[in-house]
Swiss-Prot record:
This is Single-stranded DNA-binding protein. Residues 113-176 are annotated as: Disordered. It comes from Serratia marcescens. One of its GO terms (cellular component) is nucleoid. It comes from the Bacteria. GO terms for molecular function: single-stranded DNA binding. SUPFAM superfamilies: Nucleic acid-binding proteins. A motif (Important for interaction with partner proteins) lies at residues 171-176. Residues 135-152 have a biased composition (Low complexity). Homotetramer. The gene is ssb. GO terms for biological process: DNA recombination; DNA repair; DNA replication.
Amino acid sequence: MASRGVNKVILVGNLGQDPEVRYMPNGGAVANITLATSESWRDKATGEQKEKTEWHRVVLFGKLAEVAGEYLRKGSQVYIEGSLQTRKWQDQSGQDRYTTEIVVNVGGTMQMLGGRQGGGAPAGQSAGGQGGWGQPQQPQGGNQFSGGQQQSRPAQNSAPATSNEPPMDFDDDIPF
């Protein structure tokens, strides 16, 4: 079995603000988003409806970062698959600080959910690692996140791979 462990995070939530996109010296895009997830329950003692919101820092790399910057906006609902990472940094006074983030890179997935929101992408469009190419995508639709069906690839992901990305693995069984 997996003797090295598993580090996989799956979130469905709404953006708390517009994505912040930056470019690394090598030209690769990096997008930072803040994702809110909420759970609600009824208090057994009072019968009162309660809700708790958790905020998550998410970092997207490469084509996913570009797609996020172009199509996601504050309030957009999104499905994220990534890994949990904690990084260490120093503040201006030299104190060590730690930040835990969900990192979405080559093996991760970002899928836009819901309808158009002020010029966003059509409902259900997604982008996966390698710009949506070479890996199974999540099925379209509300809350169905398992299964083997593949969807057509969105037009914004048809740009050629940059030199620092591995070659694309095309599926010979194209559904269109």
